[in-house]
């Protein structure tokens, strides 16, 4: 993050210079045009009177040409100075970021099945972004066969999201009503918040929409139990329709941020109904990589300097723990207390009859014949009675 801050500071300097140069350039050119325009009018007047330029006017014309030349040279010089500032941004990027990241890669990681999985993840990401043409082109180039049923939900969701971004609620309301039972099963407040926004949009129309707003308030009835206070606030705002909601204690109802919030809520709840994560796997992987890559490059350099290349064999493990933040916590992680190793798909956690948990590798190493003694209590049991645990 320090490297990003350094580059950002250089970039801010350049942008500041761009803004200042643009204003100075525009101001200088306007002054020149005004000065040259005035001189032109004087020349035309002199031509109408005697047809010849006076000595004074000729001198002024010479000075005007010199002023134009000096101004252009000054602007060109300032422009060169900006170029040097731009080059400093490039140097800051080269200095603070490692252009070669191949040292932390795994040979052959994108071959065969892995390449196909990556292509499928990219296709799903493009579907989520509404870039259907790009996704279909990638399917053809990668030789993927994507069923139309996989694409249709994303088409509908993107259509609704685009409507919400321009503050059109009808498509989202229709979707929420048709999926009401499933939304209520997951305790979603999406439909209520959509009705709330529509009601607020009616309030913004003033007294003209008062009757329609009262009629529309009937849609709040199914949500009265869980959103009673919010509904009371909405109904109380009707008292101030005549003077305008923006001039009332209910002005917070007009907060523009709630439109961005409703887009996030819709995306989250719609993805939950489809059994999808809110963010695409590609976005999550990219974000995690941006956090982990600097740490891995640094530890790789230390390992090479100390000639300890055997410490990191790059086989589905890292030499250090990389904290990706709570945003990337998707499930619990179990470390076997016997072997002091983190469990994996090939070495999952196993629950013994007594309730204690160890890894499968530890289980295989500890049983003697047909019996296994728990390392934490005196209970003896059969290894076959152990059950795999899923976090």
Curated annotation (Swiss-Prot):
Subcellular localization is given as: Nucleus, Nucleoplasm; Cytoplasm
Outline the extent of the LisH domain. Answer: 114-146
Query: Where does the CTLH domain start and stop, copy by copy?
Result: 153-210
Record-level Gene Ontology MF annotations: ubiquitin protein ligase activity; ubiquitin-protein transferase activity; zinc ion binding
Which chemical reaction does it catalyze? S-ubiquitinyl-[E2 ubiquitin-conjugating enzyme]-L-cysteine + [acceptor protein]-L-lysine = [E2 ubiquitin-conjugating enzyme]-L-cysteine + N(6)-ubiquitinyl-[acceptor protein]-L-lysine
Q: Where are the zinc fingers (RING-Gid-type)?
A: 336-377
Main localisation, per the record? Answer: nucleus
The GO biological-process annotations, alphabetized, read as: proteasome-mediated ubiquitin-dependent protein catabolic process; protein polyubiquitination
Which keywords describe this protein according to UniProt?
A: Cytoplasm, Metal-binding, Nucleus, Transferase, Ubl conjugation pathway, Zinc, Zinc-finger
InterPro entries assigned to the protein according to its UniProt record, in alphabetical order? CRA_dom (IPR013144), CTLH/CRA (IPR024964), CTLH_C (IPR006595), Fyv10_fam (IPR045098), LisH (IPR006594), RMD5A_dRING (IPR037680), ZF_RING_GID (IPR044063), Znf-RING_euk (IPR027370)
Which cellular component terms (GO) are annotated to the entry? cytoplasm; nucleoplasm; nucleus; ubiquitin ligase complex
The EC designation for this entry is 2.3.2.27
**Is Cytoplasm given among the entry's keywords?**
yes
Q: What class of enzyme is it?
A: transferase
Q: How does it assemble?
A: Identified in the CTLH complex that contains at least RANBP9, MKLN1, MAEA, RMND5A, GID8 and ARMC8.
Role, per record: E3 ubiquitin-protein ligase component of the CTLH complex.
Task: State the protein's name.
Answer: E3 ubiquitin-protein ligase RMND5A
> Which organism is this entry from?
Xenopus tropicalis
What gene codes for this chain? Answer: rmnd5a
């Amino acid at each position: 993050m320090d490297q990003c801050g350094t580059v950002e500071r250089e970039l801010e300097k350049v942008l500041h210079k761009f803004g200042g140069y643009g204003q100075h350039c525009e101001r200088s050119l306007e002054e020149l045009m005004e000065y040259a325009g005035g001189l032109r009018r004087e020349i035309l007047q002199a031509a109408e009177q005697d047809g010849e330029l006076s000595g004074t006017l000729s001198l002024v014309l010479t000075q005007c040409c010199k002023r134009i030349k000096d101004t252009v040279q000054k602007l060109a010089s300032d422009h060169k100075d900006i170029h040097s500032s731009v080059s400093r941004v490039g140097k800051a990027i080269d200095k603070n970021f490692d252009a070669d990241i191949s040292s932390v890669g795994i040979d052959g990681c994108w071959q065969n099945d892995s390449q196909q999985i990556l292509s499928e993840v990219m296709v799903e990401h493009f579907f989520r972004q509404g870039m259907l043409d790009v996704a279909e082109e990638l399917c053809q180039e990668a030789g993927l066969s994507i069923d139309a049923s996989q694409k249709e939900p994303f088409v509908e969701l993107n259509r609704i999201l685009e409507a919400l971004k321009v503050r059109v609620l009808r498509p989202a309301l229709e979707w929420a009503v048709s999926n009401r039972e499933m939304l209520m099963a997951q305790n979603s407040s999406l439909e209520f918040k959509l009705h709330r926004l529509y009601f607020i949009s009616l309030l913004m129309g003033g007294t003209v929409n008062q009757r329609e707003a009262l009629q529309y308030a009937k849609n709040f009835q199914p949500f009265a139990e869980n959103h009673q206070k919010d509904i009371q606030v909405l109904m109380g705002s009707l008292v101030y329709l005549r003077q305008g909601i923006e001039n009332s204690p209910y002005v917070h109802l007009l907060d523009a941020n709630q439109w961005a919030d409703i887009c996030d809520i819709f995306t989250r709840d719609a993805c939950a109904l489809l059994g999808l994560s809110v963010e695409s796997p590609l976005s999550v992987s990219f974000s995690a990589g941006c956090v982990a890559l600097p740490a891995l490059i640094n530890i790789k350099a230390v390992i090479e300097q100390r000639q300890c290349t055997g410490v990191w064999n790059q086989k589905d493990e890292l030499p250090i723990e990389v904290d990706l933040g709570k945003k990337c916590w998707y499930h619990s992680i179990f470390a076997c207390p016997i072997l002091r190793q983190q469990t994996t798909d090939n070495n999952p956690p196993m629950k013994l009859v007594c309730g204690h948990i160890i890894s499968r590798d530890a289980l295989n190493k500890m049983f003697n014949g047909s019996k296994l003694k728990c390392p934490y209590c005196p209970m003896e049991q059969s290894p076959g009675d152990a059950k795999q645990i899923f976090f």
